[in-house]
A protein has these predicted regions:
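Intrinsically disordered, low-complexity Ser/Thr/Pro-enriched regulatory regions
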Residues: 1-31, 35, 73-89, 116-118, ...
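A surface-exposed loop-and-adjacent beta-strand signature within N-terminal beta-sandwich domains
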Residues: 1-160, 165, 173-224, 303, ...
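Low-complexity, intrinsically disordered activation/interaction regions
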Residues: 170, 174, 192, 283, ...
Length: 512
């Protein structure tokens, strides 16, 4: 037993201040600008020689993609990737380490640590990008995801809808190393990690620009509505929306369990086939949230798209769809509009005034201040009808959600799918980009405000110093003599002559 104990490795214990937060034993979350404070205690069961102790805060992305072969004789393979995008080191005072470097048996050595979670990564974390927008997105701190032992909300462990092929983790790591006598190689005597859940503050970004040929999103659709299966046309129905405000989740360590909500506004336009046709009776409108996770084993230079994953074997895609609500819209009120002279004139030259029906930028497709969609392709300048539908959106409480983000290997994006039924055979659908953002923690918000104020004062001081030490001209002022003008009495003839050619000629008459 003594010989077995002598072979024991040093015991490392990592304690983190406030690690359980307001939810008891449930692991707490930390946000950007939050401070991680704690202590590392190391106890050796016997005298142990070492050379270095490393305490660091590490962020890592891990992915894998299975490669399936269609050939029966070829086995499928798997490619994987790991990216350490963040590593902060805690300096250790030399006086806290024993000299010589031998941990005495039974003695406990304590090392405090302090880390501040940064708002963004260092530039070296992303070396491959196609433009500054991609780089800026990749340098944002990604959230913890893919670990069911720490994901949750409101004190409950919940599914964060991440596939096993992608994981982002943070941890405080401690390594005790020694240089091997035989070859000088650094070997690890013992190491230990403590998981930390990071939920960074994420601000809302500008709405996504959706083109007419976008396969992932659609903000406008129009369809022909018929009177019956074998009957004539009733008219054209246009369904249009724009990207709603983001769903904003509470900050880290928040006790707020209020519903996370936003709303989407859908605008309908009906262009009747003739003046006698009335708007169709609306059916139900269902809303679903599509949660999409993109992952890759090679760094990406662009924002991911669904079609890319079908062509590039190093990329993968995983999606889950959550039902949000289903509402009857039969009571929607239609508003009748008489076309203006400009709208009637536009029908005579649609090539100039009407854009492709697939274009989804509502700032261009809306008609004036009334937010009326542009006419359908078959609009002939007749009376038309519009209706507005307000769709409330609320995140389910049986899942947990991470903010929208893009990193070199992993991305998480969300989409709102809206489907409006008109009859048993006709429906219109929209695929709307939707952002999920996150508030700062109270500590992080306070730290950010102090930092912004300090930076503002520093900029003012630098501007004042620049003004003080700015170079000044010591040359005499330039005097411009007029080429013409009245001279004092008696000096008319001795006035300075005007310039001639490129030189200045002066005539002086001596008065006697």
């Amino acid at each position: 037993m003594r010989n077995f104990a002598m072979q024991g490795k040093p015991i490392i214990d990592i304690s983190l201040k406030g690690e359980h937060g307001p939810h008891g034993s449930y692991i707490s979350s930390f946000s950007t600008m939050d401070t991680l404070e704690g202590e590392v205690a190391i106890t050796a069961p016997h005298d142990t020689r070492f050379d270095d102790i490393e305490i660091c805060f590490v962020g890592t992305s891990e992915t894998f993609v299975d490669k399936f072969s269609t050939a029966p004789t070829t086995m499928s393979s798997r490619s994987d990737a790991s990216h350490v995008f963040l590593k902060l080191h805690q300096p250790i005072d030399e006086s806290a380490l024993p000299m010589p470097r031998i941990a005495e048996a039974g003695r406990t050595y304590r090392f405090p640590f302090t880390f501040v979670i940064p708002t963004q990564l260092l530039p070296k974390a992303c070396q491959r990008y196609s433009n500054d927008q991609i780089r800026a997105a990749h340098l944002q701190l990604p959230p913890s995801m893919g670990d069911t032992s720490i994901s949750g909300h409101g004190g409950k462990l919940l599914d964060d809808l991440t596939p096993e092929m992608a994981r982002i983790s943070y941890a405080i790591k401690v390594l005790i190393t020694r240089e091997r006598d035989t070859d000088g190689k650094i070997v690890t005597l013992v190491d230990k990690s403590k998981k930390v859940r990071v939920k960074p503050a994420v601000d809302e970004q500008p709405p996504l620009v959706v083109g007419s040929n976008d396969a992932d999103y659609r903000l406008r659709q129009e369809k022909t509505i018929r009177k019956g299966v074998f009957k004539g046309k009733l008219g054209k129905l246009v369904m249009e929306t724009q990207q709603p405000r983001s769903l904003r989740i509470p900050g880290a360590r928040s006790a707020d369990n209020c519903p996370i909500t936003t709303s989407a506004k859908v605008v309908l336009r009906f262009d009747p086939a003739d003046e006698n046709c009335q708007p169709p009776r609306l059916g139900g409108l269902s809303s679903k949230l599509k949660v999409m996770t993109y992952y890759a084993t090679t760094p990406r230079r662009e924002f991911p798209r669904r079609e890319q994953t079908l062509l590039d074997i190093s990329q993968g895609y995983y999606a889950e769809t959550l039902s949000l609500s289903s509402r009857c819209m039969s009571a929607a009120q239609w508003t009748k509009h008489t076309p203006t002279a400009a709208e009637v004139a536009a029908t005579s030259n649609p090539a100039i005034t009407r854009r492709d029906s697939g274009i989804s930028d509502c700032s261009d497709s809306s008609n004036g201040k009334n937010n009326i969609p542009e006419p359908s392709e078959s609009y002939a300048g007749r009376t038309y009808y519009t209706a507005n539908l307000l769709i409330p959106i609320e995140l389910p409480t049986n899942k947990t959600f991470v903010p929208t983000f893009h990193s070199c290997l992993i991305s998480r994006v969300y989409r709102l799918d809206l489907s409006l039924s008109i009859s048993t055979t006709t429906s219109l659908s929209l695929k709307v980009p939707l952002q999920v953002t996150a508030d700062s923690s109270e500590e992080g918000a306070s730290e950010r405000a102090e930092r912004d104020a300090s930076q503002a004062l520093q900029r003012e001081a630098e501007a004042a110093m620049h003004e003080v030490f700015a170079p000044r001209s010591v040359a005499p002022p330039t005097v411009d003599f007029p080429s013409t003008g009245a001279a004092p009495p008696g000096y008319e003839d001795s006035a300075l002559a005007s310039t001639r050619g490129t030189g200045l000629e002066t005539r002086i008459r001596v008065m006697g």
